[in-house]
């Protein structure tokens, strides 16, 4: 039973009576400080034991030490960082819920409180990017579709590169980091993704070969786990600790290998 306050015995009696269940099966689900306290609270109510008894299953004592340690770390961070999330759907934070939760989980793993600074990419320009991003510890540009806010994202990526601010580009964000590098480091002023500018003279991001000729694009993205070989001198290799990894993808465009040599050399 969801409740803001502990259930009095009389309330439990009434619930048991009208729900036709034993009183021992009326368990309170109190509000908790953080979501991840909920399993611990339910264990205190012996939920697992009650469920196992109903199903006539054995119910060994669970080892929740690691979970308790995680909850403690969540509520007692030893440091703080601010990460700018530069996107175009920021009015609806749930549009980036998986990114937000990943940042929070990464913070917990490092005893760090992560504050997200929401930045509307449509408002970012070469003139104000420093003012907007000078107070952040990291910059993240997530995925998205369409050309709205693209140049603002590229300005944020350039600012991160030029000021050695940790940067993570996801999906379109990663692709735009290639576009920014090609433009501002290599000198290909017209560099772009053919998804956004089909007539670009430097298509550093292009349609994957196996997607060419597909006119009905609904449900045709490359999906699922896909192998990736990491360069041994890369940050990714340092973090993964292995050369070949597998990650899930949902893409139709990728880095154009015709530009791989010049990108690596610069």
What are these regions (language model features)?
Residues 1-266:
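N-terminal beta1-alpha1 cap of cysteine-dependent amidohydrolase-like domains
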């Amino acid at each position: 039973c969801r409740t803001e306050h502990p259930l009095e015995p009389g309330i439990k009696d009434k619930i048991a009576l009208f729900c036709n269940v034993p009183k021992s099966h009326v368990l309170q689900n109190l509000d908790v400080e953080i979501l991840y306290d909920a399993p611990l609270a339910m264990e205190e109510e012996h939920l697992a034991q009650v469920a196992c008894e109903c199903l006539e299953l054995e119910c060994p004592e669970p080892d929740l030490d690691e979970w308790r340690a995680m909850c403690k770390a969540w509520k007692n961070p030893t440091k703080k960082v601010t990460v700018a999330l530069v996107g175009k759907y920021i009015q609806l934070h749930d549009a980036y819920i998986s990114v937000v939760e990943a940042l929070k989980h990464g913070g917990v793993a490092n005893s760090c409180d992560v504050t997200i600074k929401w930045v509307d990419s449509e408002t970012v320009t070469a003139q104000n990017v420093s003012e907007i991003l000078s107070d952040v510890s990291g910059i993240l540009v997530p995925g998205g579709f369409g050309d709205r806010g693209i140049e603002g994202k590229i300005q944020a990526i350039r600012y991160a590169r030029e000021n050695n601010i940790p940067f993570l580009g996801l999906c379109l964000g990663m692709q735009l980091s290639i576009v920014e590098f090609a433009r501002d480091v290599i000198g290909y002023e017209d560099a772009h993704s053919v998804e956004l500018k089909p007539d670009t003279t430097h298509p550093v991001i292009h349609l994957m070969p196996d997607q060419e000729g597909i006119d009905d694009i609904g449900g045709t993205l490359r999906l699922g786990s896909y192998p990736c070989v990491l360069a041994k001198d890369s940050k990714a290799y340092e973090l993964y600790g292995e050369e070949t990894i597998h990650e899930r993808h949902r893409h139709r465009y990728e880095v154009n290998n015709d530009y791989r040599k010049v990108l690596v050399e610069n």
